Amino acid sequence: MRYRRDIPELFKYNAFVVISDGVNSKYGSLFAPYDYFYAWRKVHPDEAPREGVESLMSMMHGLFPRERLLDVIHNFIFFPENSKKEVKIVCRYPQYFAARKLYNNILERSRIHGEGDGKGGTYFGATGSGKSLTMLFLTRLLVRSKAFAS
């Protein structure tokens, strides 16, 4: 904590951290409580979540390929403005896959090129699944999209 107080620049470029004992692997923001660290259990959105030793490989192959890692850093980290503390929120894997799927569906069905039906679709998420953050991440993707001339 002393480094955070005395040399805050040291942590400026830290997007998130990973903790692992080889069986259980989780990621989260540097100073977040352990309860806010989550496993990345899928490489592809359509596969079954992996547990145990497989979850480490799932995190390595699902979160750290260059393109996805840069996407997460660029589009899926959020700093709430109204927080009284320094808070950094990193997406969970279901939020990442949902926002990406919604974005691709909106892009595919948009009338940008005159071919889509203009329907974006519906998103259903269970209570506590992070729907608000998923919508925030989707909005960020849409606003930053060159396809939508944003």
Residues covered by each model-derived region:
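ATP-dependent helicase/translocase motor core
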Residues: M1-S150
